[in-house]
Amino acid sequence: MTTAVKPVSIQALVEGLRQLPEAAFGPTERVRRFLQETPVSAESLAPYLTWDRQHYTRNLIDRTPLYELMAICWEVGQASSVHNHRDQNCWMAVPIGRLQVENFHLVHQDLEGRRCRLEPSNTIEMNIANPCAVDPADPVHRVVNPREFNQRAVSLHVYSRPFDTCVVYSPEQGTCGEIQLHFNTEYGKPVGH
């Protein structure tokens, strides 16, 4: 019989992340297990959550040279572009709602020529009990809040090491390109673009 883990505040999660040794941010299992064993209470996230009907929002909670932690807010039906993580490790947890991660295998990429070929590989559902890690060997994916889930969702993302660009892909068009990443809020305060 498993015992339900009592949710902690986002501040307690940050303190726990800051105590993890640098080596923990290499293999994907250690941080994923930490997120599973340390669910975050929805109430403590309130200062970091912003919503936009047009696009999901990226809200920076904590950043060190080793990692960055953000909350991404998803309205019903919103999805990210298919993207990679620049050879960085990424772990995701969903303290509010549930989401799908659609993974892709990158068959070919010519970034200079802006061409690529992807094949869908698998889909994983994330919820409060099921955080996941992006496979560094096959890191191309998108996150989706399907209409049939019929609820807002919030995902917490831990990236090691922080990065400011990524490659986005259009599987349908066979194209790819680099984009600059930005935050809607940093440490609970709006960011001007």
Can you annotate each of these PLM segments?
Residues 71-85, 136-138:
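Conserved short histidine dyad/triad with adjacent acidic residue
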Residues 91, 106-140, 181-184:
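Short acidic-glycine-tyrosine-enriched beta hairpin
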Residues 91-92, 149-165:
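A short hydrophobic beta-strand segment most commonly corresponding to one strand
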Residues 76, 87-107:
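Glycine- and acidic-residue-biased ligand/ion/polar-headgroup-sensing regions
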Residues 1-40:
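N-terminal leader/capping segments at the start of a protein or of a new domain
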Residues 172-193:
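Long hydrophobic alpha-helical segments typical of transmembrane helices together
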Residues 47, 51-76:
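A short glycine-rich, His/Asp/Glu-containing loop-to-beta-strand
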Residues 143-147:
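Asparagine-centered strand-capping/turn motif at beta-strand->loop junctions
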